[in-house]
Amino acid sequence: MQKLIIHGGKPLEGSINISGAKNAVLPIMAASILTNKLHITNVPKLTDVSTMKDLLQNHGACIRIIEHTDALEIIINTTNINKFTADYEIVRKMRASIWVLGPLLTKYGKAKVSLPGGCAIGARQVDLHIAVLKSMGAEIEIEDGYINASSKGRLKGTHFVFDKVSVGATINAILAAVLANGETVLFNCGREPEIVDLCYCLIKMGADILGVGSSTITIKGKDCLNETSYKVLSDRIEAGTYMFAAAITKGDVKICGIDYNIIENIALKLIETGIKVVQINNGVQVTYAGMLNSVDLETNPYPGFATDLQAQFMSLMSLSRGVSMITENIFENRFMHVPELCRMGADIVVRGNKAVVRGVEMLKGAEVMASDLRASVSLILAGLSTNSKTVLHRIYHLDRGFQDLEKKLSNCGADIKRV
């Protein structure tokens, strides 16, 4: 099994180009079911993208992939969809697989989707997905680990209030509503940039969507959607990760190819710690300015601080001056990186959904193991900060969400290699 070997202690200097957003391209790929042909560009080279490709092909889609140096171009033809079951063997690899549920159900009136997998962080229940689809007239049962859904005729427009903000359920609801009969109004929706990007793609396909980027989205269902091409937005989570990498290594890095508006909350949090962050053309420049102060953090739905950056921020706070309190409000069981950081000398105590982080002068290299995607990269950041060797095991998690990570870091001076 592959592992990463990191010799830390080298400030990162240079520039990093940000790849397409995984959390945008996956629902956009699922949206291809709603039309006959979808041409997607700026697609990141990730195993999760390959898994979604396999899933769509399993349903009968014909997919052509054109590989470029920094991205993929994917052309999806869904005119021959002929299978409506998303099998466990594919779905278990990635929880985003559940996003084929809404499109299959709204276009074909039936779908059978295995309960999803992905990172082992919390229950991530599908109750809200099911509730909103039922409100559109779907008949749904869970049997033998599968969501069995059907509808008599077209789904119907509905008014639905999400009990809590859910990115996944918001996406499934939008994907179902664009072909439903009548008007759907969704309240307490997720506002994440990736949801906005999906909506822009659907609008380009001919969907009628109002309130994009707000907590209330109104959708007037269409009989069909058009073929189109679409460029996926850049990945704010990848950008934030490299911003923290620059800070933790006391470096100076330009993060390029990202809209500042979608990473401003990350930039402001870094500035609060004493790191210098300057908006530049097409990105930001992050520079260590001689100090790193402890600050508290709470994860919340966008525009709050992303849960997908919590682990990386914790690595940074492990070396800060003072004590910080990190509160995880999105997922339970998302502190699995803490024992591994403590193996590297971090002083962290977990109390329920809170972690108390007391900054130490230096972390030390160790053999550590990744438990999930974001935890794995937090350990890489920790390893880059040390003056010794770190070995990271179970790095297959990384390939789900970070394209060319070793190359991008190495180009900025990091000593990191995969063996």
UniProtKB/Swiss-Prot annotation:
Gene3D superfamilies: Enolpyruvate transferase domain
Pathway annotation: Cell wall biogenesis; peptidoglycan biosynthesis
Name of the protein in question: UDP-N-acetylglucosamine 1-carboxyvinyltransferase
Record keyword Cell cycle present: yes
Localization (cell): Cytoplasm
Domain of life: Bacteria
Residues involved in phosphoenolpyruvate binding: 22-23
NCBIfam families found in the cross-reference section: murA, PRK09369.1
Keywords: Cell cycle, Cell division, Cell shape, Cell wall biogenesis/degradation, Cytoplasm, Peptidoglycan synthesis, Pyruvate, Transferase
Family: Belongs to the EPSP synthase family. MurA subfamily.
Catalytic reaction(s) noted: phosphoenolpyruvate + UDP-N-acetyl-alpha-D-glucosamine = UDP-N-acetyl-3-O-(1-carboxyvinyl)-alpha-D-glucosamine + phosphate
Gene Ontology biological process terms in this record: cell division; cell wall organization; peptidoglycan biosynthetic process; regulation of cell shape; UDP-N-acetylgalactosamine biosynthetic process
Gene: murA
GO CC annotation: cytoplasm
Active-site residue numbers: 119
UniProt: UDP-N-acetyl-alpha-D-glucosamine binding residues: 95, 164-167, 308, 330
SUPFAM superfamilies per UniProt: EPT/RTPC-like
EC number: 2.5.1.7
CDD domains the UniProt entry points to: UdpNAET (cd01555)
Modified residues (2-(S-cysteinyl)pyruvic acid O-phosphothioketal): 119
Main localisation: cytoplasm
